[in-house]
Structure formats: C-alpha cells, structure tokens
C-alpha cells in the first residue's frame, strides 16, 4: 500500500472530498486507511465497567485508500507515489518532484 501511518493526505473522493488530515491507521488487507477528522461517525456505546455512562461517541471510520492522495511535503499539493531503490532499499518518492518521502510514524 502506498499510504503509510503518519502521512498527510487529501481526500479526493466521497462525502469528505477536499479535506486533509494525517493517517492514524492503515488496514492493508482491506485496502483502507483511517484519516484524522475525516469520515466521522457516531458510535453507540453500551455502558461498561471502564465507561459506566456509555453514550454516543464520535470516531473516525476507515475509507478506501483509492479515495485519498498523498500530500507533497514541500508544496502541500496532492501527488502520486512512486518507488525507487536507494542503496539496495526500496523507498517511496514524490512523483511531481522526485523527492524521497520520509516516513514519520
């Protein structure tokens, strides 16, 4: 998957189109990502010992990885992701500028 945890992304399709946020979690087997502040849903929580009140919680739901695009770290514009081998290691690069993407989990 070309999107990693900690990446800044922009939503390019769906009800939250145009919103930007940081990737909180990835689900590679399902091709889904959870983005901070995007696709917020209300979850009804039963009372438990940890949360005796229960109630309605707002949380982010996962969206498909094809609906988000990585933001270029320098220009802050959406860009595609490419791969390149540097010193025998596969690294992600920004297609627009050719710059290496630093993974900051």
From Swiss-Prot:
For biological process, the GO terms are:
translation
Q: Which cysteines are joined by disulfide bonds?
A: none
Q: Which GO terms describe its cellular component?
A: ribonucleoprotein complex; ribosome
**Domain of life, per lineage:** Bacteria
Tell me a Gene Ontology molecular-function term this record carries: rRNA binding
InterPro entries xrefs? KOW, Rib_uL2_dom2, Ribosomal_uL24, Ribosomal_uL24_CS, Ribosomal_uL24_KOW, Translation_prot_SH3-like_sf
Alphabetical UniProt keywords: Ribonucleoprotein, Ribosomal protein, RNA-binding, rRNA-binding
Protein family per UniProt = Belongs to the universal ribosomal protein uL24 family.
Q: Cross-referenced HAMAP family, in alphabetical order?
A: Ribosomal_uL24_B (MF_01326_B)
Q: How does it assemble?
A: Part of the 50S ribosomal subunit.
Purpose: One of two assembly initiator proteins, it binds directly to the 5'-end of the 23S rRNA, where it nucleates assembly of the 50S subunit.
What is this protein's record name? Large ribosomal subunit protein uL24
Its organism's taxonomic lineage begins at: Bacteria, Bacillati, Bacillota, Bacilli, Bacillales
């Amino acid at each position: 998957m070309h999107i990693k945890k900690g990446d800044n992304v922009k939503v390019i399709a769906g009800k939250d189109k145009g919103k930007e946020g940081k990737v909180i979690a990835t689900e590679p087997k399902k091709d889904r990502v959870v983005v901070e502040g995007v696709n917020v849903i209300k979850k009804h929580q039963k009372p438990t010992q940890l949360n005796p009140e229960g109630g309605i919680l707002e949380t982010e739901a996962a969206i498909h990885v094809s609906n988000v695009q990585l933001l270029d770290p320098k220009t802050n514009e959406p860009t595609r992701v490419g791969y390149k081998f540097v010193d025998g290691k596969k690294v992600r690069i920004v297609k627009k500028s050719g710059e290496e993407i630093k993974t900051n989990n």
